[in-house]
Amino acid sequence: MDNILKASNMEGTSTMTVTSRSSEDSSCISNHEQDTDTHKDGDTSGLENSKISKRKWMKEFFKLSKSPASKSSRSIGSMKSNQSLVSMKSSDDGNSYKNDYSSICGNSLPSAGLSRSNSVKELKLDSTGSQRSKNNVAMLARSSTTSQTTCSSSSSSSSYNSIKGNENDILLQNNNHFRHNKEIPQSKGSSNINTASIMSQYNVDTQATAIMSDMQKQYDSQQMTSPFVNEDLHFDPNGEVSHVIKAIFKEIGYKYDDFSDIPVFQLMQEMYQLVKKNSSARRTKITDYASKLKEKEAQLKSQNDKILKLETTNKAYKTKYKEVSLENKKIKEAFKELDNESYNHDEELLKKYKYTRETLDRVNREQQLIIDQNEFLKKSVNELQNEVNATNFKFSLFKEKYAKLADSITELNTSTKKREALGENLTFECNELKEICLKYKKNIENISNTNKNLQNSFKNERKKVLDLRNERNLLKKEILLIECHGSYSLLLVSNILTCYRFLLPSDTIIETESLIKELLNMNNSLSNHVSSSDEPPAEYSKRLELKCVEFEEKLLYFYQELVTKKIIDVIYKCFINYYKKSRQTDQKSNQNSSTPYKQSQRQVPHSIK
C-alpha cells in the first residue's frame, strides 16, 4: 500500500508536467503550422525552412521514442521548476497565454501559485517598461526645454549610443541563438525599422537647432551690423550668406517666398519653434523604437529559453509516460488482489479509485495528444512520399537520358576509331616534320652565330667610325682656331700698313694688300672644303694637300719677305733715325734756353706725322 501511495503522488506531479507540456506542444505546433501556411504563398524560402524544421522535429521525436526510460528517482523539485517555466509562455506580439492547469487538473489540484507567479512577472515587466518610458519622456522634456546647444548635442549623442548598443546586443543574441530562431517567424514590425535613417534625420535636426540657437545668441548679445542684414534688421537677399540660409530652410522644411520683409528676430523664432517640434517628434519616435526593440529582445530571449526547456520536458514526458504505464499495471494488479482479499477500508479504496480514474483520464488525454502527433507525422510522411514520387519521376527521366547518352557514346567510339587512324597518319607526318625542323634549327644556330660575329665586328667598326668622327671634329675646331689666328694676324698687318703708309713705298703696299686678300680667300676655301665631304676620299686628300702646300708657300713668302724685310725693317730704321735726331735737338734746346722753368717743346717731323 505504501508503494501505491508513492506511485500516486509521483503520478500527480508527472501528470501536471505532462498536461502542461502537451498543451504547450499543441499550441506551438498550431502556431508553427499557421506561420508556415501564411508564408507559403509569399516566399519559397519559408517552405524550405518549414520542411527543414519538420524533419528536425521528426528526428528528435524518433530519438526520444527510442531512448530508454529514465529512472523514477529523478527529483520532484526539478520537475516543478520545469512546470513553472513551461506555464510562462508569451506570444510574439507581447500577449501572454493563460495557465490551463485548473481546467486540466480540476478543482482538486492547486494551480493558484503558478498563476500568481505568472501575473507577478507580468507586473514586473510592465513596471520596468513604464519606468523606461518615463525616463525617456523626462530626458526628452529636458532636452526640449533647454536652449543650449551643448545639452541637445550631448542628449542626441547619448541616445544614439544607447540605440546603437541595443542594436549590437540584438545582433549578438541573434547570432548566438540562430539555431533556435530558425523555426520562429520574426515579426514584420522589427524588420521595417530603419534606425540608421532615423538617426541621420535626428542628427540633421540637432545640427540645425544648434546653428539657429548660436545665431540667435550672437544677435542678442552683440546687436551689431552683419554682412547679410540691412539697417532695418531684415535679411538682405543679395547678401553673402543668403544662399546658406536658403539651404538651411530647405533642410528644416521651412517654406519661404521672400524673407527680405520679415525681421530677423521673428524669422529666427519661427525657425527655432519649427525645429523644436520636428526634433521632439523624432526623439519620441526614436525612444518608441528603442522600447519596442528591447521588448522584442526580451521576447526572443524568453522564447529561446522556453524552447530549450520544452525540449528537456519533452524527454521527461516520454520517460514519465512509461513509468505511469508501469504504475497503472501495478495498480490494476493491486485492485485484483484487493478484490480477492477481504479489506474493510472502503473509504480509502474509494479515494484511491477516484484518484486512479483521474490518472486514467489524464492518460487518455495524453494518448489523444499522441494521436494528434501521429497524424502530424502521417502528414509529413505523405509529403515525403510525394517527394519520393517526384524523385522517381526524375529518375525515369534520367534513365531515358542515359539511354540516349549510351547511343551517343557508341557513335563517339566509332568516330574516335576514325580519329585514331587519322592521328597515326598525323604522327608519321609530324615525325618527318620534326626531322626537317631539326635541320632548320641547326642552320638557324649557324646563322645566329655568324650574325653574332657580324654584330661584334659591326660594333667594333662603329666604334672606330665614332672615334674618327671625334677626331675629325677636333681637327675642324683646330682649323677654325688656326683660321681665326691667321685672320687676326692679317688684320694686324693691315693695321700696321694703314698706320705707317707714309713710310713704305707704294709697291709694297699694293703687294701686301693683294696677298692679304688672297690669303683670306684661301683660308675660307679651305674651311669650306673641309666641311663638305661629298667627294671620294682619294681626290679629297689630294686636293687638300695641294691647297695646303700653296697656302704654306704664300704664308712663308708673306711673313718672311714682305712683312719682316720690306715693312718691319723699314719701320725700324726710320724709328732709329728719328730717335737720333730727337736726341740732337734736345741737346741744342738745352743750350739755347734762357729761362730755367720753360719746357722745351719737341717737334715731331712732318715725315713721321
Swiss-Prot record:
Residues 1-50, 68-96, 124-165, 586-609 are annotated as: Disordered. It comes from the Eukaryota. Interacts directly with MPC54, NUD1 and SPC42. Interacts with ADY3. Interacts with ADY4. Probable component of a SPB complex composed of ADY3, SSP1, DON1, MPC54, SPO21/MPC70, NUD1 and CNM67. Keywords: Cell cycle, Cell division, Coiled coil, Cytoplasm, Cytoskeleton, Meiosis, Membrane, Sporulation. It is found in: Prospore membrane; Cytoplasm, Cytoskeleton, Spindle pole. Involved in the pathway that organizes the shaping and sizing of the prospore membrane (PSM) during sporulation. May provide a meiosis-specific scaffold for the assembly of other proteins on spindle pole bodies (SPBs), and may be a limiting component for SPB formation. Residues 10-31, 82-96, 127-136, 587-609 have a biased composition (Polar residues). Belongs to the MPC70 family. It comes from Saccharomyces cerevisiae (strain ATCC 204508 / S288c) (Baker's yeast). This is Sporulation-specific protein 21. Disulfide bonds: none annotated. Residues 32-43 have a biased composition (Basic and acidic residues).
